[in-house]
Amino acid sequence: MATRANIGIKLDNGQYKMIYSHWDGYPGHVGKVLVQHHDSYENAIELIEGTTICSFHEDGSYDRYDDGEADYYDSIEDALHGYDYAYVFIEQWKCYTKSMYGNIEEVDLKTWR
């Protein structure tokens, strides 16, 4: 079963531009790879400018599907609708998820910094 994630940036207008990542979206994999291999604004832009991401590899490389493009969301809550995690680059990667009660929670990524 896939652990779905949205990955992106916060735009100047307050919206979030996010690309879907299908496999292994949990912080111990995608979060770790983003922090260790894609920890810059330029890298975040590169990720969201392509098609949907199939999977990330431990070395930082990734595979893409042939289709799909970035979506725009008005809030982290919207970006999490239907997804397990949302990763946003704002000076560094931040990770969000919904608790079992529906509250938005930030997941600590400092383990991999």
Task: Please annotate each region the language model reported.
Residues 35-113:
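Low-complexity intrinsically disordered segments
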